A protein has these predicted regions:
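Acidic/histidine-rich alpha-helical segments that form the ligand environment
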Residues: 24-81, 88
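Inter-helical turn/loop segments and adjacent helix faces that build the functional surface
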Residues: 12-15, 46-47, 71-90, 107-118
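Intrinsically disordered, polybasic Lys/Arg-rich low-complexity tracts
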Residues: 122-162
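Conserved alpha-helical segments that form or flank metal/cofactor-binding pockets of metalloenzymes
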Residues: 1-33
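Short terminal or interdomain "cap/linker" segment that borders an active site or interface and mediates
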Residues: 91-132
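Generic L/I/V-rich hydrophobic alpha-helical segments across diverse proteins
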Residues: 5, 68, 86-90, 97, ...
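Amphipathic alpha-helical coiled-coil segments
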Residues: 1-11, 40-43, 98-108
Length: 162
């Protein structure tokens, strides 16, 4: 998706490599998320480090998701020439970015649920279903309750059989 944005910027006559205040902030945030994951990997048990990593990825995906929503809004208000560049890129990438966000959020939720000692659904329903929209994500999240009960009952039966 970086290449898609670079191509758009170039076509608009902008330098995709220009150092801007926004670019500096994004770099700082990204570096901070990576350092956070590295710290958790060194200092925490594997389960906690995995949750930290999932949260960091979810934070990053949330920002990327917002950026593509903004590109979509810009495409609606742009000149015809700008819109001709922005709209196809938005349509190509935005749905994939939705999927990334919903899947990472599902993993983060289930890892936390597991860490709190409750029945988790791993992989999460967002991962096992084709979840591309907020409605589909809500339906997948809602379905996890039934899946968690099945998982709990199966584990209980296996434990009592021992």
């Amino acid at each position: 998706h970086v290449q898609v944005l670079s191509d758009i910027l170039t076509a608009l006559g902008l330098d995709p490599d220009a150092e801007t205040p926004g670019r500096k902030v994004v770099r700082y945030l990204g570096t901070s998320l990576v350092k956070t994951m590295e710290l958790a990997s060194r200092c925490a048990d594997p389960q906690a480090a995995q949750i930290v990593a999932a949260e960091c990825v979810t934070l990053a995906e949330t920002k990327v998701h917002l950026n593509w929503e903004l590109i979509g809004e810009l495409a609606k208000k742009a000149t015809a020439e700008e819109s001709a560049l922005l709209t196809p890129a938005y349509e190509q990438v935005e749905r994939e970015e939705d999927e990334h966000l919903y899947h990472t959020a599902g993993w983060t939720r289930e890892l936390w649920i597991q860490a709190l000692g409750m029945p988790a659904v791993l992989p999460p329903p967002e991962e096992t279903r084709k979840v591309d929209t907020a409605i589909e994500a809500a339906e997948a999240k809602k379905s996890r309750t039934a899946s968690a009960k099945v998982t709990t009952n199966t584990k209980a039966k296996k434990a009592s059989a021992r």
